[in-house]
């Protein structure tokens, strides 16, 4: 069996470019593989003389004759009588199948068992619904079919499958546009099509493709869906060969695209072309699945139909009355305007979706340049209800990309930056959804944003910026600059004033600025605020840019947003707003004096003297980097200092993060030591501030960290355990082992290392930014290089973006002056060799 399987796989891989071009060819390989397995299953079943007491059925992919290289062989064995005699023979039969290399998943049940299990579990019922008889008798087949016909009513089955699908979707963030999709289970993957067929079979009573093709409702959609299904089967077969898994990893994508022998476009790699084709087909399957579910739901929902001119409303859905649309082009946008102003209507019915999709060709240059349709689109952007879902529907029907042609270029556009987890278009819609949710209701932690977004003069400006902020990707060059021009031209075309169009364009051009500044620069430094204020110029721009930035980052990768990043952005916003409003701004020394006074208020007697002496050791920068709350907490810890031990404090911050304070005698290579200790204590550093006393004898270090071992919020007891672990690692530092952190295999990505050096002549320091792939003990390696080259780290901001990091260090020479260019070159060379 193994040799035949290898032959089928080798032939498939050898002819992959042909199969890729004509996906229906994959069915021969799937069927050949299934048939070979079937021969083995049946031959051995008969050799063990089991047919008198048992029947055997093929389930799942085996039942559909769609066996992939990594598929399990699903068997349903029906025991004819309750007291079977040849149980030992059956056990030896299953064992032999495993010995022959088959991954067997099987059940052994009597007819009564099937009745009980299939009646309770929709998954089991579905497996019998689609099973195929291998060795059986008409009598047993009839009994099984009779049980199935009475087990699940149509509506009950439909609801079960809908709930099952919703749970599955949650595992993939409810989108078919994940960058490394699971080709079996992701939304838009094979399971979506199979689920749609189960609904068609059980709820619509269609037995096969021919019945579906003859139907009035689905005849025009089934062929296209089958073509998409075939393509994704091609991709799954190839992925099973390359990795033996169903997830289409970045590494697999590159290997498979090479084997497909694709010809690249001007600005797109072949892998991008392949993945765009995947997402196009995944979207088609997702839409087909949705069509089937919505069609059944509409057919079983009783609601009065109300007529409103060209439209009708049934329940919470709106439709367009039948007839040609060639002279009713305005209805394409009018229907969305109607939804946007009616709270009780939230979607379009299935026949109308089909009608709109069939008439997308009416969106031509005349339509795009018509002032009336421009006004309609603006009205949609100003909708009171359902905006983000309407724009997503417009995209799914092909309307949005037909109207904004450049948007069509980013549909399915990959993002090989190792921190986005969605395609450009899916990320864009998540940005718009975040904006919409922020506008509708105040969310915990976003009270400021809720207030700001509802005070905007023109909400459509923000939505246009969100829609266009990444539209320049995949076109070659700086996507912000490309998008700025596209967005300005479009905004002008649809009727915005020059000033408003310029604002949209400026937002697109600068949409990365605020996140970059907050994550790389010291926002407690007045120069950082002054420089950013000069870029922004006024509070109107600042408000729009802040709202765009927050919602952009939140839509990038669910795992990357946290309260710390939010606080940095919010502080940058508030400080810049104060600057633009010309509010009185205290000097660095004034801030230090105020904060020191606030701290000293809570102490008295000998404690007051001790803390005053401690605080007197530091200059104004220490107080500017730590607010009064932090200073009070740190001072309280210092009072509990034990002779010969470092002062260590741990506390929760921003719900899921841990703030660490460590006061210790300053020494050469201290940052390197602390980083190693925290790493081996299970903590991942995302921000570090190092303050040294005036005589350089004491170092007060503050770290913001993430607990590496799980994402659950730690309780107080666990926080204390973390503190104890840090102290233990301090005491046993000389015997600590290296980090064993695991990261993904990223061999297919070029080894990147970008080092950027900016000298701050006023502070006599350097801002060193290092961009590279994440790897075990990376921060420790960087700290080691910096230490060996005679530099001292003043602050560090560790920005982990998925599998890529952008680490920014404020460093100075051991002589307390800026680092020379020659030394920076040595550091860069050493980092290149080490990383």
Predicted ranges, named:
Residues 2-3, 13-16, 152-296, 346, ...:
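Conserved nucleotidyltransferase catalytic core and NTase-mimicking acidic/glycine-rich helix/loop elements
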Residues 37-87:
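Active-site nucleotide-donor binding segment shared across nucleotidyl transfer reactions
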Residues 20-33, 175-185, 317-321, 373-379, ...:
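Active-site flanking loop/helix segments enriched in acidic
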Residues 65-89, 227, 423, 451-581:
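Divalent metal-dependent catalytic cores for phosphoryl transfer on phosphate-bearing substrates
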Residues 256, 268-317, 389, 531-835:
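Regulatory modules associated with amino-acid/nitrogen control
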């Amino acid at each position: 069996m193994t040799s035949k399987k290898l032959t089928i796989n080798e032939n498939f891989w050898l002819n992959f470019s042909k199969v890729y071009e004509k996906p229906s060819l994959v069915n021969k390989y799937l069927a050949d593989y299934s048939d070979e397995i079937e021969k083995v299953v049946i031959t051995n079943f008969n050799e063990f003389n089991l047919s008198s007491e048992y029947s055997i059925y093929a389930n799942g992919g085996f039942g559909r004759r769609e066996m992939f290289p990594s598929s399990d062989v699903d068997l349903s064995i029906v025991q004819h009588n309750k007291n079977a005699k040849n149980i030992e023979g059956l056990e030896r039969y299953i064992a032999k199948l495993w010995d022959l290399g088959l991954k067997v998943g099987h059940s052994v049940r009597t007819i009564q068992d099937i009745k009980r299990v299939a009646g309770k579990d929709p998954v089991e019922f579905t497996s019998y619904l689609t099973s195929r008889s291998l060795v059986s008798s008409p009598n047993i087949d009839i009994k099984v079919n009779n049980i199935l016909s009475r087990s699940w009513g149509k509506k009950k089955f439909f609801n079960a499958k809908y709930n099952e699908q919703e749970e599955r979707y949650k595992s993939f963030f409810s989108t078919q546009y994940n960058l490394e999709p699971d080709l079996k289970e992701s939304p838009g993957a094979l399971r979506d099509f199979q689920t749609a067929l189960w609904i068609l079979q059980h709820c619509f009573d269609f037995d096969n493709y021919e019945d579906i093709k003859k139907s009035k409702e689905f005849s025009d959609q089934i062929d296209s869906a089958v073509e998409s299904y075939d393509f994704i089967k091609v991709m799954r077969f190839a992925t099973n060969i390359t990795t033996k898994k169903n997830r289409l990893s970045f590494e697999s994508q590159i290997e498979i695209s090479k084997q497909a022998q694709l010809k690249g476009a001007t600005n797109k790699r072949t892998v991008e072309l392949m993945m765009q084709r995947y997402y196009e087909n995944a979207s088609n399957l997702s839409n087909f699945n949705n069509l089937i579910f919505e069609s059944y739901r509409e057919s079983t929902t009783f609601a009065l139909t109300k007529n409103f001119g060209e439209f009708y409303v049934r329940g919470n859905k709106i439709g367009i009355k039948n007839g040609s649309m060639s002279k009713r082009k305005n209805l394409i946008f009018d229907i969305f305007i109607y939804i946007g102003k009616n709270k009780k209507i939230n979607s379009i019915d299935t026949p109308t979706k089909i009608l709109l999709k069939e008439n997308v060709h009416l969106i031509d240059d005349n339509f795009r340049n018509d002032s009336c349709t421009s006004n309609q689109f603006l009205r949609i952007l100003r909708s009171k209800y359902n905006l983000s879902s309407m724009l997503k529907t417009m995209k799914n029907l092909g309307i949005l990309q037909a109207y904004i042609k450049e948007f069509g270029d980013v549909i399915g556009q990959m993002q090989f930056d190792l921190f986005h987890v969605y395609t450009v278009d899916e990320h864009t819609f998540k940005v718009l959804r975040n904006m919409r949710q922020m506008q509708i209701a105040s969310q915990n932690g976003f009270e400021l944003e809720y207030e700001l977004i509802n005070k905007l003069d023109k909400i459509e400006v923000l939505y246009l910026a969100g829609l266009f902020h990444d539209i320049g990707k995949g076109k070659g060059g700086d996507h912000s600059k490309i998008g700025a021009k596209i967005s300005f031209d479009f905004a002008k075309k649809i009727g915005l004033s020059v000033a408003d169009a310029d604002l949209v364009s400026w937002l697109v051009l600068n949409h990365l600025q605020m996140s970059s500044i907050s994550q790389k620069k010291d926002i407690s430094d007045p120069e950082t605020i002054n420089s950013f204020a000069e870029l922004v110029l006024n509070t109107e721009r600042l408000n729009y840019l802040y709202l765009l930035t927050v919602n952009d980052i939140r839509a990038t990768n669910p795992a990357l947003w946290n309260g710390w990043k939010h606080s940095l952005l919010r502080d940058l916003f508030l400080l810049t707003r104060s600057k633009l409003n010309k509010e009185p701004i205290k000097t660095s020394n004034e801030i230090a004096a105020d904060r020191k006074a606030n701290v000293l208020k809570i102490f008295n007697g000998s404690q007051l003297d001790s803390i005053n002496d401690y605080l007197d050791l530091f200059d104004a920068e220490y107080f500017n980097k730590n607010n009064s709350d932090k200073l009070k907490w740190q001072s309280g810890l210092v009072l509990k200092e034990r002779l010969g031990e470092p002062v260590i404090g741990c506390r929760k911050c921003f719900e899921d993060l841990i703030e660490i304070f460590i006061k210790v005698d300053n020494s050469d290579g201290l940052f390197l030591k602390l980083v190693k200790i925290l790493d081996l204590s299970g903590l991942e550093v995302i921000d570090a501030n190092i303050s040294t006393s005036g005589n350089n004898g004491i170092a007060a270090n503050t770290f913001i960290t993430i607990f590496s071992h799980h994402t659950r919020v730690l309780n107080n007891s666990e926080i204390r355990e973390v503190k104890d672990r840090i102290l233990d690692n301090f005491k046993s530092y000389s015997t600590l082992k290296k980090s064993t952190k695991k990261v993904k295999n990223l061999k297919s990505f070029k080894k990147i290392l970008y080092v950027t050096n900016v000298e701050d002549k006023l502070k006599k320091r350097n801002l060193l930014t290092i961009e590279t792939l994440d790897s075990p003990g990376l921060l420790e390696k960087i700290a080691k290089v910096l230490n060996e080259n005679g530099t001292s780290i003043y602050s560090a901001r560790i920005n982990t973006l998925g599998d890529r990091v952008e680490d920014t260090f404020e460093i100075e020479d051991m002589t307390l002056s800026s680092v020379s260019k020659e030394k920076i070159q040595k550091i860069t060379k050493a980092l290149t060799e080490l990383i």
